[in-house]
Structure formats: C-alpha cells, structure tokens
C-alpha cells in the first residue's frame, strides 16, 4: 500500500451511526483510496486489493453518499468508471460509454433489484419480466469495433469514456474473429466483452516465467491484463488469451435482436465466443437458483469468475430504465463472498495522512487471501485495537490486538484487509498490550482525540496537531497541487513533489514558482542531483513558467479544499469570478451553526439569522454547492495559514476567469418539477430524462423553479406555481419541448 494514505477510522461503525463530520472525513478518504486502486487496476494491472474488497469499498462509499446526499456531486467516484487511459497507448473515444455495474451481495439485494425494476416500470406482479443470468468473468473489459463486419479497432474500457487502443494486440487473440460471418451483421457494431486467461494456461505461463527468471503473475486477471496491454503485439501473441462477448455499444442501424439473449445468440452466429452458462429466467428465484448452480461449479470451471450478472432481457425495457451515475438500472452483478486467512502480526506501524489522522497498520507474515498476497491490514484506530467499537461497545469478545498475535484476516471491503478476530490460544506468553502513540511519529507534535462539542463524544481517530509543519501533511498537499487535474506541471508529478520537499527545495505551492530562482542561487544545483540533468531541469523550469497563468477552476481545485473537486471548483469559479471574491465570501459568511453562539445580551445588530447571513445563503444557493461544501470552503479560508498560502501563490500565478458555458438542450440548467399523474412515463423515468438533458429536478415548487410539468390531478404544486408565475406545461408539451 502507499504510505501516508488517509485513514478510515470509522470503518467499524455502521453508516447509519456516522455523524456528518465522520461521514465527510471518511468519504474524502475513500475517494482518494478508490481512485488509487482504480489506477492500479486499470492502468498498472497490479491491484493490491481483491475484487470483493474493492466492491465493498465502493459499496461503503455509495452508502455514505446515500445517507448524506450533500456529499454527492459530479466529481463523486460513484459517477465515474475505471481510470484514465495510460499514456503508453493511443486513446480511443467510446461512442457509447463503457459503464460498470452496481453490485449485490445477498439474496435480499437481488430480490430488491427485481422489485426496484418493477416499481420503476410500474409493472404489476403478474406481468412477466424476463432476465438473463451469466457468469461474471474476471478479466479485462474490451470493446471490439466492427465496420462492414471487419474488425477495425479494439480498445480497453479505460475511464469508461475513452480507453486505450489495443487493436494490434487483440488481432493476435485466436478466438476473436477478424471478420464477422453470417446474416444480420450490423453495418457498425462495438462488441463488448472480457479478455481473460484460463486457469491451466495461467499456471503454464507462470511456470515459463519462473523458468526464464521473469516475474510471475499474481492471478489470471493480472496476467490477462498485462498480456493485452503490451507495447509489443508479439508478446501478446505468445500469451494464451481468450474472449467472451456479452454486450455491445454503438450498433448501426441497430442491435441484431430485440432482447439481450437474442443479441448474444446473434454474436454466436457471427463467430464470436459467448458463455454457454448464460440462461434466461423470469423471476428472482430463477436468478438465485442459477447463482447457486454456478457457485457450486465455480471451482471446476476453466476460468475465474467473481459473480453472476443479471440483466433485464427486453431491450425496450432497458431503454426505459436507462442509467444512474456510473451504471445501468437494468443490470446488477451478484458477487461471491470474500475470503479469510490466518496469519501473524509481526509489527504495528503508524501512518499519517493528509488530514493528520494516525492510522495503525498491522504488518503481517505474508498470506494469500482471495488470490492476492496480503502483508498489511488496517487496524482502523486505537479503540479498534483495544476491542472497542464505534459506539463504545465491546467487539471481538473484548480481545485486544497485540504484536505477535495470530489473527484472522479478511478481504471484505476495507482499503487494505482488516483483522476480524484474534486466535487467543496462540498468543505468545510475552505479548503486551499495544500502547498507541500520543505524539505524531513524523513531526512529534501532540496527537489528540478531539471531542465533539455538541455530543461530547470523543473522536475515534487521533490526529496530529502539527498541521502543515508536519511533513506528512505538507507533502500530501503538494502532491495534490501538482496532480493531473490541478496544475499538472509536466515533469513535476507527485513523486518529484515529494522528493523536492525532502530536499527542502519546496515547502508550499508558491515555492514551485520560485524554484528556478532558488536553484540559480544554490550551490547544490537541481541538474546535478540524481535523476536530473541540465536539459530535464530547464524543461521543468519552462513547464513551471507556462503554468503562471491557469484557469480559475483548476487553481481552486489545486488548493485541496475538502469536498471541492473539479466540478465544484468550476461552480465556484463561475459564480465568484476570482479567488479574491471567493475568499472574501468565505470570510464574510456566517454559518447557521454559529447562530447559537449569540446570547440574549448580544446586540440585535450583531445577532445572526438562523439560516445564516446573506453571504452564506448565496454560497449555499449555488447550484450543486450545498451546506457541506460551503462549510468546507469557509473553514479553509478562515484558517490564517491557508490564506497566507493562497496570498503567496497569487503573487506568482494569475488565475483566469472561466467563459460561460452554452446550454445544449432547452431545459439545460433549468430547475424542473413534475406533479400529477404522468401517463407516458413513470415519475422516475421523467426525472431520469430531465437530468440526462441537463436539468435539475426538484421535489417542490419555489421561486427558483423554472418549469412545472403537470399531469392530471395536479394540486397544490400547480397552484403555487401559478401564484409565483412559474411556467407550467403538460406532459405532451414536455415531450414537444425536449424532442
């Protein structure tokens, strides 16, 4: 694992028990960890967590967003897929995005999926609703583009929008036809499927690798991904890769069938390999029966699978159901359970994250869990070590965790595997209780557990009070500042930022733009350091100079304000127009939580409004910027050191205001309310359609409402809209408007 990653101190707490602050902290930490794992999985083909671990990590993230909707925005990972394509390959834009699937881990979740589909479509229980069920292959997603029946391009999924061009490599896979055969082949079709490696072929490949003194692969998925993403197609040709087709993207003039199973049958007729274990069923019981059947056969299959995928069979119903965030409403992946293993804790180390959180990590005797070698496990926080849960309750039957203990490790949703129990009868005689440090192991500042003034409850995590004088926190801020979506200075990535900090060349963002001047005055020139030369140093200085002018939204994003991702940075940039205006608004804002501070003796002129002052209301009224984001912005600029960092940076950099964005649909950017009985679509379908067109759907009418779509039986909302002068149209007029 990467050192100094943010902790997840509340992981042992149910999401329903998290406070808003705890949820915000964990959401931010999860966002960083998931993005890191996406890069390892999709770009490096070297995941450090199992699929079950990753899936449950995603589930935790999405559950937090479901309970705290203000945390969800356009930058949320729940709206994203995969990771950006590698720079090693040419990029290919997917005409139809390659999305991922929502996951289910229990029978109840599958039954709820079926019920949810019925509710969305307003189908009676007696109405037939067919599904397909197929094994979920553990490989690398790939899109094959055929034009006139001829394979013209192949691409990985990448970030779902664009992937890597692997055409030359895919042409070496024997199972993938260069030309489709048979009747009914569409003029253009993007075949979606999975490139994988069979178990026997994987073992044989690893034997050859070991014999040749080359690194072996951890599992068949890594072997398949690494083999497909080779720069030399001849290496790919030498690897026994295979392929299953199961979906499609663009299809002109249309897909070769009216249902999922008809289209997949057509794939088989065209000469594409399809999975023989795919079936069609008509209820949840049929789905679960097939899941158990495949689970029983899993060990005997010649390839790895990690679950079963269920899809609504009718393409017409799929179209009605549409998509939500990063996945379709009409499909779900029913995943197999995670695995456990027993090992020994050799040491407990403390890592310090960007927010100062001290995270205990168990260093383990390496053990294989779920096909991945595990040597680290999270211990969450000091209470978890002491067998105390998030609400003060006893966990693990009151057995604490000590160095030397034999423990059961599980890969089931944590950032790194977690210790779930201690084998007490194997505890060494000399093992002593672990003493959690009260000082930061990096900067030696005091580490404290804060107390919530409202609840009086002590925070689960102990934090370093050193702030930016703590190298661990300062380095993380610098690494974020130079990241791809921030200043993105060529030649100055996260690794170089860390090194420059260690060499005392930079301590805060503004120092980057003073680097050349300092280098000229220094006796120890950058070009003389290991890994650098005169040309590379000059190229870096030129790249830094080119970033002295930067878009305002990138500048705001680079500051690393909690909850302010790329999209929220754009929203703030468009609204305020300058860093100074944003800073002044943050300083002048009076938050609702501060209203309680005024006593009866407080002069009326100084008392604050219960809903916050006008500056606060203006910020929270920005489309997409709620109270959680606004509070983070206010707290950032109220911290004197942060203001100083920004002021110094503004001496070196000139942020440029954003240009206005043109609307792309008649309702783009407008607030729409639906009321009454809709006859041509369900309420969920109406909301999904409006959001796809760029509108914001509200549940009530207010002065901010731009349009009310009223069906038969519209009542109080229609009356209020008329009183406010809100434009009102019928359902038919809505379809005329949006086409």
Swiss-Prot record:
GO terms for cellular component: cytosol. GO terms for molecular function: DNA ligase (NAD+) activity; metal ion binding. Keywords: DNA damage, DNA repair, DNA replication, Ligase, Magnesium, Manganese, Metal-binding, NAD, Zinc. Residues 662-739 form the BRCT domain. Its cofactor is Mg(2+); Mn(2+). It holds the Pfam family BRCT. NAD(+) binds at residues 51-55, 100-101, 134, 157, 194, 311, 335. Its EC number is 6.5.1.2. GO terms for biological process: DNA repair; DNA replication. The keyword Metal-binding applies. The keyword NAD applies. This is DNA ligase. The lineage of its organism: Bacteria, Pseudomonadati, Pseudomonadota, Alphaproteobacteria, Hyphomicrobiales.
